[in-house]
Design a protein with these regions (language model features):
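Short loop/turn motifs at secondary-structure junctions and domain boundaries
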Residues: 10, 60, 80-81
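Iron-sulfur (Fe-S) cluster-binding segments and ferredoxin-like electron-carrier domains
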Residues: 49-56, 68-81
Protein backbone atom coordinates (compact mmCIF):
# COMPACT_ATOMS: atom_id res chain seq x y z
CA UNK A 1 0.00 0.00 0.00
CA UNK A 2 1.25 3.43 -0.91
CA UNK A 3 0.89 6.34 1.52
CA UNK A 4 1.36 9.93 0.41
CA UNK A 5 1.95 12.81 2.81
CA UNK A 6 -0.48 15.69 2.39
CA UNK A 7 0.67 19.26 2.94
CA UNK A 8 -1.18 21.68 5.22
CA UNK A 9 -2.53 23.45 2.12
CA UNK A 10 -4.09 20.11 1.10
CA UNK A 11 -6.25 20.09 4.24
CA UNK A 12 -9.61 21.88 4.32
CA UNK A 13 -10.81 23.99 7.21
CA UNK A 14 -13.53 22.59 9.46
CA UNK A 15 -16.79 22.22 7.52
CA UNK A 16 -15.07 22.64 4.14
CA UNK A 17 -14.28 20.48 1.11
CA UNK A 18 -11.34 20.80 -1.29
CA UNK A 19 -9.77 19.07 -4.29
CA UNK A 20 -6.12 18.02 -4.10
CA UNK A 21 -3.79 16.36 -6.59
CA UNK A 22 -2.36 13.12 -5.21
CA UNK A 23 -0.25 10.87 -7.41
CA UNK A 24 -1.49 12.63 -10.55
CA UNK A 25 -5.21 12.45 -9.78
CA UNK A 26 -7.75 14.65 -8.07
CA UNK A 27 -9.00 13.53 -4.67
CA UNK A 28 -11.75 15.12 -2.59
CA UNK A 29 -10.73 15.87 1.02
CA UNK A 30 -13.47 16.69 3.54
CA UNK A 31 -13.25 18.16 7.04
CA UNK A 32 -16.42 16.97 8.76
CA UNK A 33 -16.68 18.29 12.32
CA UNK A 34 -12.88 18.33 12.65
CA UNK A 35 -12.41 14.81 11.24
CA UNK A 36 -10.71 14.38 7.86
CA UNK A 37 -11.97 12.06 5.11
CA UNK A 38 -10.86 11.42 1.53
CA UNK A 39 -12.75 10.06 -1.45
CA UNK A 40 -12.69 9.99 -5.24
CA UNK A 41 -13.43 13.39 -6.70
CA UNK A 42 -15.93 12.08 -9.29
CA UNK A 43 -19.65 11.80 -8.57
CA UNK A 44 -20.99 8.49 -9.96
CA UNK A 45 -24.18 10.21 -11.14
CA UNK A 46 -22.83 12.49 -13.90
CA UNK A 47 -19.14 12.90 -13.04
CA UNK A 48 -19.45 16.12 -11.07
CA UNK A 49 -16.39 17.34 -9.11
CA UNK A 50 -17.17 16.41 -5.50
CA UNK A 51 -14.28 18.54 -4.19
CA UNK A 52 -16.20 21.59 -5.39
CA UNK A 53 -19.28 20.54 -3.46
CA UNK A 54 -20.54 21.62 -0.05
CA UNK A 55 -21.17 20.00 3.31
CA UNK A 56 -24.78 20.06 4.44
CA UNK A 57 -26.07 18.19 7.49
CA UNK A 58 -23.04 15.90 7.54
CA UNK A 59 -23.33 15.00 3.85
CA UNK A 60 -21.16 16.02 0.91
CA UNK A 61 -23.40 17.51 -1.77
CA UNK A 62 -22.33 17.29 -5.43
CA UNK A 63 -22.34 20.76 -7.06
CA UNK A 64 -23.86 19.51 -10.32
CA UNK A 65 -27.07 17.70 -9.40
CA UNK A 66 -27.21 17.65 -5.61
CA UNK A 67 -26.49 13.98 -4.95
CA UNK A 68 -25.37 13.61 -1.33
CA UNK A 69 -22.68 11.28 0.01
CA UNK A 70 -21.52 10.30 3.47
CA UNK A 71 -17.83 11.33 3.54
CA UNK A 72 -17.07 8.53 6.03
CA UNK A 73 -18.31 5.71 3.78
CA UNK A 74 -18.85 7.21 0.31
CA UNK A 75 -22.44 5.93 0.31
CA UNK A 76 -25.42 7.81 -1.06
CA UNK A 77 -29.11 7.50 -0.22
CA UNK A 78 -30.08 8.31 -3.82
CA UNK A 79 -29.51 4.83 -5.21
CA UNK A 80 -28.91 1.58 -3.34
CA UNK A 81 -25.46 0.11 -3.80
CA UNK A 82 -23.93 3.26 -5.29
CA UNK A 83 -20.93 4.70 -3.49
CA UNK A 84 -17.83 6.75 -4.11
CA UNK A 85 -14.55 4.97 -3.34
CA UNK A 86 -12.90 6.32 -0.19
CA UNK A 87 -9.27 6.48 0.92
CA UNK A 88 -7.89 5.97 4.40
CA UNK A 89 -6.23 8.94 6.09
CA UNK A 90 -3.68 8.45 8.86
CA UNK A 91 -2.49 11.16 11.23
CA UNK A 92 1.05 10.84 12.58
CA UNK A 93 1.90 13.78 14.80
CA UNK A 94 1.32 16.91 12.73
CA UNK A 95 1.42 15.00 9.43
CA UNK A 96 -1.50 13.53 7.48
CA UNK A 97 -1.03 10.63 5.05
CA UNK A 98 -3.46 9.34 2.46
CA UNK A 99 -3.49 5.66 1.55
CA UNK A 100 -3.99 5.55 -2.22
CA UNK A 101 -5.63 2.11 -2.20
CA UNK A 102 -9.39 2.55 -2.69
CA UNK A 103 -11.72 1.21 0.01
Amino acid sequence: MESVKLTRSDLPERGKVIEVFVEGRLVCVVNLEGELYAMDNVCPHWGGPLGQGTLENGKLRCPWHGWEFDPRTGETTRKAGVKVPTYELTIKGADVYIEMTKK
